[in-house]
């Protein structure tokens, strides 16, 4: 879609449904994380959001099957971009990735020494296109949405998300953003997103990582899904 300055009327253009070729959603991890879309991964602090994404990144870097997939669902190794402000790469991120058996040549980081990365930073698109990345992880949302964006303002958050939505759509890259949940209890994960509810609306898929009641295995977690099939949810245990 062409962007026009607000003071210049836009030319009317229409397209008929008959002129649109329907296509199926492609999945990075069925039925949780689609290709070419923005996914929001939520959870309380310490519930394993970063560990989950690094484990998935390690499997993808080798072309190995993801959890709950059939053994014959392996694919080509993928390049993953991982950005985080919560853990250092040298003593936490890379050791975790290595311990999960990942290919270090396929996990890359955009350097933020001179300038912090934000949703609208052109370096994101440049890195995705240059290295043919299939997954970009931004951990956590509050560090990358931008200092000038109020997370409680729907207009501001939607504008920031639109940058990432465009990159995902244009390149086919999956973008996963991690976020801490608010303190509300006994409610849908949709309503535990920190900030404006429009954040949940902007994401195409929403996952919530929660602890299970299995005291014999405290490392067990549930990824709960509320996504392309809005209103439905699925829980499966993972390590």
Please tell me what each predicted stretch does.
Residues 4-9, 24, 28, 45-47, ...:
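Conserved inter-motif catalytic segment of the P-loop NTP-binding fold
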Residues 59-77:
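Post-Walker A helix-loop "phosphate-sensing" segment adjacent to the P-loop in P-loop NTPases
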Residues 20-26, 118, 187-191:
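Short gly/ser/thr-rich secondary-structure transition/capping motifs
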Residues 52, 56:
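Hydrophobic positions on the alpha1 helix immediately C-terminal to the Walker A/P-loop
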């Amino acid at each position: 879609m062409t962007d026009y300055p607000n003071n210049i009327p836009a030319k009317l253009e229409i397209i008929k449904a008959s002129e649109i070729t329907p296509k199926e959603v492609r999945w990075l991890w069925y039925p949780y994380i689609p290709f070419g879309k923005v996914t929001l991964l939520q959870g309380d602090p310490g519930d394993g959001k970063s560990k989950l994404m690094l484990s998935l990144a390690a499997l993808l870097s080798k072309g190995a099957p993801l959890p709950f997939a059939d053994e014959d669902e392996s694919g080509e190794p993928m390049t993953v971009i991982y950005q985080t402000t919560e853990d250092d790469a040298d003593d936490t991120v890379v050791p975790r990735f290595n311990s999960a058996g990942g290919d270090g040549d396929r996990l890359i980081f955009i350097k933020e020494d001179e300038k912090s990365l934000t949703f609208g930073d052109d370096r994101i698109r440049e890195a995705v296109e240059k290295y043919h990345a299939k997954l970009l992880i931004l951990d956590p949302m509050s560090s990358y949405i931008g200092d000038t964006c109020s997370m409680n303002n729907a207009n501001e958050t939607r504008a920031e998300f639109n940058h990432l939505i465009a990159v995902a759509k244009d390149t086919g890259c999956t973008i996963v953003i991690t976020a801490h949940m608010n303190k509300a209890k006994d409610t849908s994960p949709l309503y535990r997103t920190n900030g404006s509810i429009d954040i949940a609306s902007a994401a195409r898929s929403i996952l919530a990582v929660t602890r299970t009641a299995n005291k014999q295995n405290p490392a067990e977690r549930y990824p709960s899904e509320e996504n392309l099939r809005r209103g439905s949810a699925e829980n499966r245990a993972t390590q």
